[in-house]
């Protein structure tokens, strides 16, 4: 059975349109609860970000789980990695996050964590889908006996527990005293958490975009819109800036000069710092989107590098397969398995700050030897079958032309987004003009297949 609803990061879409409806959410809760109950599940934890639609979907998921005989514990707005952590520490059987991460407020999504705080396997998601399809298409949604229904409770100290966990990943011998940091919480799930973590560790914190109203999440702010953070760092003459996305699993940073430091650069800094401390860095996992310059810089340190499919779940899978501990995406999902089971922007930022304090260097100076290849990414809106566009002869010809011209001095990647109706065209080259030229060539070929 192929995937019908689960993308690279759970189920996601526009609120009010199938599948992000209360009816679907209830049936998904029931299907997941039924699968989990069969293996002994007694309780799941449900968290969410700050989207207005989170209330509706949370209630629907509750009903579905309770109908399947599974108890529910609610946390309120919390970062995605906080739910992964709490699922494990509370000995819950599974965790659920209601969030569309970096997407606008009118989108939402639902994703699951296992009892170890890791994302569900493909096999588990397919089993949930099997029951879900039967409930949607055949109406086969049953309810357990009245005395077996699930109950709902609220975890009142969830945020405080997670703050202490984050602080616990930072060495006791170090302090952030003397650092001025601007923090952009994207009006998202970490709005009441991130600033307090850094303050309690001694930093002077200027907090921006920390007043969620249900519809301003990720709106011209956070890890996908860095302008406001860059401006704030310069205005306040801060040492650096930290940007999270709506569910705080993605990290981007800004140096004291207002320059953006992306996930590849941060991952390089983390690997180099660990190596300098004498820790064994067996290798680093990136993705198909990771920059060639990043790969070459790791090679100069003697650190092996492998690419996973795009999506943090696939980075985790390859980390487990190789036994390596460090990986991530240039978009800012950073995986540090010595500390967390999933991407955690706050924890990752603390390890970057640790690296800077130990080296005595500023953020820009700490990565001077990293020479990134110019990378051009063009998103083409999809209004048809992606497979048709990706395999169309004219598109294949454009890709072949670009690859032949670039040779070993560049890369071409063409793929369908796992979270949005887009085909992503990425071209990387030593020469920025060539990168842009061939990205436009391929994008034009894709647009011709899917005219607006």
Curated annotation (Swiss-Prot):
<dbReference type="GO" id="GO:0008966">
    <property type="term" value="F:phosphoglucosamine mutase activity"/>
</dbReference>
<keyword id="KW-0597">Phosphoprotein</keyword>
<dbReference type="InterPro" id="IPR005843">
    <property type="entry name" value="A-D-PHexomutase_C"/>
</dbReference>
<dbReference type="InterPro" id="IPR005841">
    <property type="entry name" value="Alpha-D-phosphohexomutase_SF"/>
</dbReference>
<dbReference type="InterPro" id="IPR005844">
    <property type="entry name" value="A-D-PHexomutase_a/b/a-I"/>
</dbReference>
<feature type="binding site">
    <location>
        <position position="245"/>
    </location>
    <ligand>
        <name>Mg(2+)</name>
    </ligand>
</feature>
<dbReference type="InterPro" id="IPR016066">
    <property type="entry name" value="A-D-PHexomutase_CS"/>
</dbReference>
<feature type="active site" description="Phosphoserine intermediate">
    <location>
        <position position="101"/>
    </location>
</feature>
<dbReference type="GO" id="GO:0005975">
    <property type="term" value="P:carbohydrate metabolic process"/>
</dbReference>
<feature type="modified residue" description="Phosphoserine">
    <location>
        <position position="101"/>
    </location>
</feature>
<feature type="binding site">
    <location>
        <position position="249"/>
    </location>
    <ligand>
        <name>Mg(2+)</name>
    </ligand>
</feature>
<dbReference type="InterPro" id="IPR005846">
    <property type="entry name" value="A-D-PHexomutase_a/b/a-III"/>
</dbReference>
<comment type="similarity">
    <text>Belongs to the phosphohexose mutase family.</text>
</comment>
<dbReference type="GO" id="GO:0005829">
    <property type="term" value="C:cytosol"/>
</dbReference>
<dbReference type="GO" id="GO:0004615">
    <property type="term" value="F:phosphomannomutase activity"/>
</dbReference>
<dbReference type="InterPro" id="IPR050060">
    <property type="entry name" value="Phosphoglucosamine_mutase"/>
</dbReference>
<protein>
    <recommendedName>
        <fullName>Phosphoglucosamine mutase 2</fullName>
        <ecNumber>5.4.2.10</ecNumber>
    </recommendedName>
</protein>
<dbReference type="InterPro" id="IPR016055">
    <property type="entry name" value="A-D-PHexomutase_a/b/a-I/II/III"/>
</dbReference>
<keyword id="KW-0413">Isomerase</keyword>
<dbReference type="GO" id="GO:0009252">
    <property type="term" value="P:peptidoglycan biosynthetic process"/>
</dbReference>
<dbReference type="Pfam" id="PF02878">
    <property type="entry name" value="PGM_PMM_I"/>
</dbReference>
<dbReference type="Pfam" id="PF00408">
    <property type="entry name" value="PGM_PMM_IV"/>
</dbReference>
<dbReference type="Pfam" id="PF02880">
    <property type="entry name" value="PGM_PMM_III"/>
</dbReference>
<dbReference type="InterPro" id="IPR005845">
    <property type="entry name" value="A-D-PHexomutase_a/b/a-II"/>
</dbReference>
<comment type="function">
    <text>Catalyzes the conversion of glucosamine-6-phosphate to glucosamine-1-phosphate.</text>
</comment>
<dbReference type="InterPro" id="IPR036900">
    <property type="entry name" value="A-D-PHexomutase_C_sf"/>
</dbReference>
<feature type="binding site" description="via phosphate group">
    <location>
        <position position="101"/>
    </location>
    <ligand>
        <name>Mg(2+)</name>
    </ligand>
</feature>
<dbReference type="InterPro" id="IPR006352">
    <property type="entry name" value="GlmM_bact"/>
</dbReference>
<dbReference type="GO" id="GO:0006048">
    <property type="term" value="P:UDP-N-acetylglucosamine biosynthetic process"/>
</dbReference>
<dbReference type="GO" id="GO:0000287">
    <property type="term" value="F:magnesium ion binding"/>
</dbReference>
<keyword id="KW-0479">Metal-binding</keyword>
<keyword id="KW-0460">Magnesium</keyword>
<feature type="binding site">
    <location>
        <position position="247"/>
    </location>
    <ligand>
        <name>Mg(2+)</name>
    </ligand>
</feature>
<dbReference type="Pfam" id="PF02879">
    <property type="entry name" value="PGM_PMM_II"/>
</dbReference>
